[in-house]
Amino acid sequence: MASNDTPAFANNEIMLKCEGLTRIYREGPQDVTVLDALELDVRAGERVAVVGSSGSGKTTLLNLLGGLDRPSAGEVRIAGQSLAEMGEAALGSFRNRHIGFVYQFHHLLAEFSALENVAMPLLIRGQTRQEAQARAREILAKVGMEARGEHKPGELSGGERQRVAIARALVTDPSLVLMDEPTGNLDQTTAGHILALMDGLAAQSACAFIIVTHDPGLAAHQDRVMRLDQGRLSEDA
């Protein structure tokens, strides 16, 4: 169920829209175009896999979609709002309300427990510690980590840390979740549980997912597979 400050979107409404998205980096005397006038629409409740060779720009794309980097040209709109029109403070608040991130490396805070890491986005949002930790326990249970909530990241296995990172991304009931190899550190059974959780969220809360992966099985599980090649996205046959 969507959080009170997250507007409800019906499945099939456009949740994410990219128009002319371009990212150019300066390398010495040359400009290198990583993304070239890219176009993408993702509907609420849709799960889209992005595949492509290493160095094709997949991580750059995720960073632009999440507002962690600014495009050289073009626009990203999420839940009807343009990221380009937001200052840094407004963008940070928007990310907290609308976007969940799961990276290939978990980026958990080492000095906090799993429970505290998962609750952190809700505390930043202004919820009480009691409210935030109750919701964090709920989502940790959904990823099979209810018994490990008091452990710090250094006391967890790689797969456990990844599950905590996934829980942290989902705890705010985001409109959009951006994932970079989300099941890479998980065994097959746990990965299956995570996929089922994603399926349920997409269907029930109209959360959209964009999943960067090299795993053909994970890609095939999604509603669409898009291939990034030479800065452009095309639907994979």
UniProtKB/Swiss-Prot annotation:
Which Enzyme Commission numbers does its entry carry?
Answer: 7.6.2.-
Q: Which UniProt keywords apply?
A: ATP-binding, Cell inner membrane, Cell membrane, Membrane, Nucleotide-binding, Translocase, Transport
Q: A GO CC term?
A: plasma membrane
Q: Which domain of life is it from?
A: Bacteria
Q: Which residues form the ABC transporter domain?
A: 16-237
Which residues are ATP-binding?
A: 52-59
Single Gene Ontology MF annotation: ATP binding
* Location within or outside the cell: Cell inner membrane
Please give one Pfam family short name.
ABC_tran
Enumerate the PROSITE patterns for this protein. Answer: ABC_TRANSPORTER_1, ABC_TRANSPORTER_2, LOLD
Among Gene3D superfamilies, the record links this protein to:
P-loop containing nucleotide triphosphate hydrolases
Q: How does it assemble?
A: The complex is composed of two ATP-binding proteins (LolD) and two transmembrane proteins (LolC and LolE).
- Specify the protein name: Lipoprotein-releasing system ATP-binding protein LolD
Gene transcribed to yield this protein: lolD
